[in-house]
UniProtKB/Swiss-Prot annotation:
The gene is norC. It comes from Pseudomonas aeruginosa (strain ATCC 15692 / DSM 22644 / CIP 104116 / JCM 14847 / LMG 12228 / 1C / PRS 101 / PAO1). This is Nitric oxide reductase subunit C. Its main location: membrane. It comes from the Bacteria. It is a single-pass membrane protein.
Length: 146
């Protein structure tokens, strides 16, 4: 019994595979669209978060830091900094102190510049970082310290 691969068989494989992957694409798109609002933390966005994002952009923090894996890899990841540095309660105090003592001037170590931010700007930046830390990223980026 000899079987050969015919044009009809190839056509059936092509169309069957195409339909399968189109249906798979549509199912994954539907799933993403359905779960995205739950994962973005959009409901918790406040005016302070928006102002903090503006401070982030105006001072080009992404030029050195990454946020949720996006940005430069010169300085630590800040998407998980709230959990690493005091949690919700102590983070504003930590960030105020950290921003005030910059630059550290430690020989052989990368230095963060002094941005001369006001206390309100640092608080807004802290709110932005707290908000971004609550985005469900499916544990991305995978590193702990940044």
């Amino acid at each position: 019994m000899s079987e050969t691969f015919t044009k009809g068989m190839a056509r059936n494989i092509y169309f069957g595979g195409s339909v399968f992957f189109i249906l798979l694409f549509l199912a994954l798109t539907y799933h993403t669209e359905k779960t995205l609002p739950e994962r973005t933390n959009e409901a918790a966005m406040s005016a302070a978060v928006v102002r903090g994002k503006l401070v982030w952009e105006q001072n080009n923090c992404v030029g050195c830091h990454t946020l949720l894996g996006e940005g430069a890899y010169f300085a630590p990841e800040l998407g998980n900094v709230v959990g690493r540095r005091g949690g919700e309660e102590g983070f504003n105090t930590f960030l105020q102190a950290w921003m005030n003592i910059q630059p550290l001037n430690v020989p052989g170590r990368r230095a963060m510049p002094q941005f001369h931010l006001s206390e309100g700007q640092v608080d807004d930046l802290a709110e932005f970082l707290k908000w971004s830390s609550k985005i469900d990223t499916n544990q991305w980026p995978p590193n702990k310290e940044g």
